Protein backbone atom coordinates (compact mmCIF):
# COMPACT_ATOMS: atom_id res chain seq x y z
CA UNK A 1 0.00 0.00 0.00
CA UNK A 2 1.27 3.41 -0.95
CA UNK A 3 0.03 6.24 1.24
CA UNK A 4 -0.85 9.74 0.13
CA UNK A 5 1.44 12.53 1.28
CA UNK A 6 -1.16 15.18 2.14
CA UNK A 7 -1.75 17.98 4.64
CA UNK A 8 -3.91 21.12 4.67
CA UNK A 9 -2.51 24.28 3.07
CA UNK A 10 0.06 22.79 0.70
CA UNK A 11 1.43 24.76 -2.25
CA UNK A 12 0.88 21.85 -4.62
CA UNK A 13 -0.27 18.26 -4.68
CA UNK A 14 1.33 16.23 -7.45
CA UNK A 15 -1.05 13.55 -8.71
CA UNK A 16 0.45 10.54 -10.45
CA UNK A 17 -1.65 8.23 -12.57
CA UNK A 18 -1.06 5.04 -10.58
CA UNK A 19 1.85 3.28 -8.90
CA UNK A 20 4.26 1.23 -10.92
CA UNK A 21 5.44 -2.16 -9.74
CA UNK A 22 8.61 -0.67 -8.14
CA UNK A 23 6.54 1.76 -6.11
CA UNK A 24 4.14 -1.00 -5.08
CA UNK A 25 7.09 -3.15 -3.99
CA UNK A 26 8.86 -0.42 -1.98
CA UNK A 27 5.77 1.44 -0.75
CA UNK A 28 7.12 4.78 -2.00
CA UNK A 29 5.86 7.05 -4.78
CA UNK A 30 7.89 7.32 -8.00
CA UNK A 31 10.33 4.64 -6.82
CA UNK A 32 11.44 3.19 -10.18
CA UNK A 33 15.06 4.20 -10.88
CA UNK A 34 14.04 5.44 -14.35
CA UNK A 35 11.37 7.76 -13.00
CA UNK A 36 12.53 11.38 -13.05
CA UNK A 37 10.00 12.85 -10.60
CA UNK A 38 12.41 13.52 -7.73
CA UNK A 39 15.05 15.03 -10.00
CA UNK A 40 12.48 17.17 -11.83
CA UNK A 41 10.83 18.67 -8.75
CA UNK A 42 14.26 19.44 -7.30
CA UNK A 43 15.56 21.11 -10.46
CA UNK A 44 12.27 22.99 -10.89
CA UNK A 45 12.64 24.56 -7.44
CA UNK A 46 10.11 22.66 -5.31
CA UNK A 47 12.77 21.08 -3.06
CA UNK A 48 16.07 22.43 -1.74
CA UNK A 49 17.77 19.06 -2.08
CA UNK A 50 17.29 16.00 -4.25
CA UNK A 51 15.04 13.66 -2.28
CA UNK A 52 14.99 9.89 -2.61
CA UNK A 53 11.67 8.06 -2.81
CA UNK A 54 12.11 6.80 0.76
CA UNK A 55 12.38 10.44 1.90
CA UNK A 56 8.97 11.32 0.41
CA UNK A 57 7.55 12.49 3.77
CA UNK A 58 10.04 15.39 3.65
CA UNK A 59 7.95 16.82 0.80
CA UNK A 60 5.57 18.13 3.45
CA UNK A 61 8.43 20.33 4.73
CA UNK A 62 8.39 22.05 1.34
CA UNK A 63 4.56 22.29 1.36
CA UNK A 64 4.23 19.75 -1.44
CA UNK A 65 2.22 16.55 -1.45
CA UNK A 66 1.57 13.46 -3.57
CA UNK A 67 -1.48 11.40 -4.39
CA UNK A 68 -2.57 9.25 -7.33
CA UNK A 69 -5.64 8.80 -9.48
CA UNK A 70 -5.71 5.00 -9.26
CA UNK A 71 -4.25 2.85 -6.49
CA UNK A 72 -3.86 -0.35 -8.54
CA UNK A 73 -0.21 -0.94 -9.50
CA UNK A 74 0.63 -1.74 -13.12
CA UNK A 75 3.75 -2.08 -15.24
CA UNK A 76 2.60 0.79 -17.46
CA UNK A 77 0.02 3.51 -16.82
CA UNK A 78 -1.81 2.66 -20.06
CA UNK A 79 -3.01 -0.53 -18.34
CA UNK A 80 -5.39 1.58 -16.22
CA UNK A 81 -8.91 1.58 -17.67
CA UNK A 82 -11.34 4.45 -18.18
CA UNK A 83 -13.64 3.37 -15.34
CA UNK A 84 -10.70 3.40 -12.91
CA UNK A 85 -9.63 6.87 -14.06
CA UNK A 86 -13.13 8.34 -13.81
CA UNK A 87 -13.62 6.84 -10.36
CA UNK A 88 -10.18 8.08 -9.35
CA UNK A 89 -11.03 11.56 -10.62
CA UNK A 90 -14.10 11.71 -8.38
CA UNK A 91 -12.07 10.57 -5.36
CA UNK A 92 -9.34 13.09 -6.19
CA UNK A 93 -11.86 15.95 -6.20
CA UNK A 94 -12.96 14.94 -2.69
CA UNK A 95 -9.35 14.89 -1.43
CA UNK A 96 -8.60 18.28 -2.96
CA UNK A 97 -11.80 19.77 -1.52
CA UNK A 98 -10.72 18.50 1.91
CA UNK A 99 -7.09 19.71 1.76
CA UNK A 100 -7.41 22.76 -0.57
CA UNK A 101 -3.82 23.09 -1.82
CA UNK A 102 -3.01 26.14 -3.93
CA UNK A 103 -2.52 23.87 -6.96
CA UNK A 104 -3.16 20.33 -8.11
CA UNK A 105 -0.71 19.07 -10.73
CA UNK A 106 -1.99 16.05 -12.63
CA UNK A 107 0.95 14.27 -14.21
CA UNK A 108 -0.30 13.24 -17.62
CA UNK A 109 -2.57 14.88 -20.19
CA UNK A 110 -4.47 11.77 -21.29
CA UNK A 111 -5.10 10.71 -17.68
CA UNK A 112 -6.43 14.20 -16.89
CA UNK A 113 -8.71 14.21 -19.93
CA UNK A 114 -10.11 10.79 -19.10
CA UNK A 115 -10.45 11.27 -15.34
CA UNK A 116 -12.21 14.63 -15.70
CA UNK A 117 -14.04 14.08 -19.02
CA UNK A 118 -12.11 16.92 -20.65
CA UNK A 119 -11.03 17.11 -24.28
CA UNK A 120 -8.23 19.01 -25.92
CA UNK A 121 -6.38 19.87 -22.71
CA UNK A 122 -3.17 21.81 -23.09
CA UNK A 123 -0.15 21.59 -20.82
CA UNK A 124 -0.12 23.99 -17.90
CA UNK A 125 -2.88 25.73 -15.98
CA UNK A 126 -6.41 24.58 -16.79
CA UNK A 127 -9.62 26.60 -16.81
CA UNK A 128 -11.26 24.43 -14.17
CA UNK A 129 -10.61 24.78 -10.45
CA UNK A 130 -11.53 22.63 -7.48
CA UNK A 131 -12.72 25.19 -4.97
CA UNK A 132 -9.83 27.67 -4.83
CA UNK A 133 -7.32 25.08 -6.09
CA UNK A 134 -5.85 25.71 -9.53
CA UNK A 135 -5.62 22.60 -11.71
CA UNK A 136 -2.48 22.11 -13.78
CA UNK A 137 -1.56 19.37 -16.24
CA UNK A 138 2.14 18.54 -16.38
CA UNK A 139 4.04 15.90 -18.36
CA UNK A 140 4.47 12.58 -16.60
CA UNK A 141 8.05 12.12 -15.34
CA UNK A 142 8.08 8.39 -16.12
CA UNK A 143 11.15 7.17 -17.94
CA UNK A 144 8.73 5.86 -20.58
CA UNK A 145 7.78 9.47 -21.44
CA UNK A 146 9.90 10.75 -24.32
CA UNK A 147 10.08 14.30 -22.92
CA UNK A 148 13.61 15.38 -22.10
CA UNK A 149 14.60 16.20 -18.54
CA UNK A 150 14.98 19.86 -19.54
CA UNK A 151 11.43 19.99 -20.95
CA UNK A 152 10.02 18.36 -17.82
CA UNK A 153 11.87 20.79 -15.56
CA UNK A 154 10.67 23.74 -17.66
CA UNK A 155 7.02 22.64 -17.35
CA UNK A 156 7.23 22.07 -13.60
CA UNK A 157 9.16 25.31 -13.07
CA UNK A 158 6.31 27.22 -14.72
CA UNK A 159 4.01 25.94 -11.96
CA UNK A 160 6.53 26.77 -9.23
CA UNK A 161 6.94 30.31 -10.56
CA UNK A 162 3.16 30.80 -10.83
CA UNK A 163 2.80 29.77 -7.18
CA UNK A 164 5.53 32.21 -6.14
CA UNK A 165 3.70 35.02 -7.98
CA UNK A 166 0.52 34.07 -6.06
CA UNK A 167 2.46 34.24 -2.80
CA UNK A 168 2.25 30.51 -2.25
Curated annotation (Swiss-Prot):
Keywords: Cytoplasm, DNA damage, DNA excision, DNA repair, DNA-binding, Hydrolase. GO terms for molecular function: DNA binding; pyrimidine-specific mismatch base pair DNA N-glycosylase activity; uracil DNA N-glycosylase activity. The keyword DNA damage applies. Pfam families: UDG. InterPro entries: MUG/TDG, MUG_bact, Uracil-DNA_glycosylase-like, Uracil-DNA_glycosylase-like_sf. CDD domains: UDG-F2_TDG_MUG (cd10028). HAMAP family: MUG. Excises ethenocytosine and uracil, which can arise by alkylation or deamination of cytosine, respectively, from the corresponding mispairs with guanine in ds-DNA. It is capable of hydrolyzing the carbon-nitrogen bond between the sugar-phosphate backbone of the DNA and the mispaired base. The complementary strand guanine functions in substrate recognition. Required for DNA damage lesion repair in stationary-phase cells. Binds DNA as a monomer. This is G/U mismatch-specific DNA glycosylase. It comes from Enterobacter sp. (strain 638).
